[in-house]
Amino acid sequence: VVAPAGVALRSQPSTTGQRLALLPESTAVSLIQTVQGDPYDALGGSQRNDWQQVKAGELEGFVAALWLEPGGPGEQEESSRPREMRGVWICSHHHSQVWQSREALARALDELVELGWNTIFPAVWNQSFTAWPSAVMERHGLPKQDPVHAAAGIDPLQLAVELGKERGLTVIPWLEYGFAAEPVGASRGLLAAKPAWAALDRRGQVVEDGGLRWLNGLDPEVQAFLGELVLEVVERYGVDGVQGDDHMAIPHAGSHDQATLERYRKATGKRPAARDDDPSWSRFRIEGLSGWVKEMGVRIHRVRPDLLWCLSPCPLPTGLTQLMQDSTGWLNNGSVDLLLPQLYRNSVAAYRLVLEGNLRPLARERRRQVVAGLTLRANGQNLEEATLLEMVRISREAGLGGVALFHHTPLMGGDQRIARALLSQRG
């Protein structure tokens, strides 16, 4: 038989038995016998008590029978199928306790692996700070590392890579803030040190959008800075890729600094647009962001061709009209390897609608490069288990490459009911 998801090999047929090993996804094991043991959670809130005594390499122990599937003659065909991504965003220390210690992160990753998750997106760029000690930040006269992590003497990115790889996880650092600088009201953020990098609106004020103050993502110096951070991550750490959030964006009210307006005049021969939704002005900014996205893909793949350049944009049409994100264009022309649109909806009908709208402009062969971004809470409402499971089913039916859930803290909190239910829906 084959373990299709990460499962614990235990010394006894019990969830309290000593954990001998964590078997990564698709581990081949030899069945010795089926035994009755302590009960464990199964599907639909029920329980089972059937365990398999198995041999995995030189180790022998017990695995809950629920998490095994037949192998045999069809095993080679099964293993050749593209692996479904089952990802989880792990927020920064502002919203997650896993960064308190090496042991806390190890426990969190053990739980994820045991429940069948195979990819993590640890937050590493937030509120003007990097989680890792950054030579790029230091070179620009900025704090070398988030002071919380610096005081603790830890490098969360190195820990995530080291502990994640030990457990067979795909590790894709998440540069959450992108071209956003800091929350509105922050007293000593990035813009205090680099005021010339600010995105300006028509009144010459710093753009505030979504509760954040923004950098000018069309400023060549700002683009170079963020690009340097991305490359520092992929060059220094053994990651599987790097991911930008919906904040890899140009807010529609921004880009009114004189240098950007002058570049617009030279490129189009037109005066500054009277409206922020002017088609020519919007197209200029969309192309400016898309050019940076494409360039970063080229530079990342020069470091290592197998690295994944991933973006998690706001879904269409809002992402395009309000944030200048031509996300389906990025995927269709090969600028990115993976798209994780944030399809955060609180009903199945709304989810189906937004998914269809975002798949329609895509070439059908690109669908495996789309991973549905789902959330446990949308529009102020917690999602019901049945709703989330149906969204996962719809995503698979559409031929997507997997799902990613926002975020780790609510997923793994409490009784982990939803996390276990989602495991039962694995592809």
Question: Where are the regions that the model predicts?
Answer:
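Boundary regions of SH3-family modules and the immediately adjacent low-complexity/disordered segments
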Residues: 14, 43-84, 88
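Glycine-rich, aromatic-flanked loop segments that form ligand/cofactor-binding clefts
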Residues: 117-127, 154-207, 243-246
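Beta-loop motif signature
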Residues: 2-49
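Polysaccharide-binding and catalytic clefts of secreted carbohydrate-active enzymes
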Residues: 194-329, 333
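Active-site-adjacent "subsite" loops/lids of carbohydrate-active enzymes
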Residues: 80-102, 172-236
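Substrate-binding cleft of secreted/luminal carbohydrate-active enzymes
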Residues: 335-353, 358-361, 365-427
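Aromatic-lined carbohydrate-binding/catalytic grooves of carbohydrate-active enzymes
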Residues: 115-152
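Catalytic domains of carbohydrate-active enzymes, especially glycoside hydrolases
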Residues: 103-130, 236-240, 335-338, 398-402
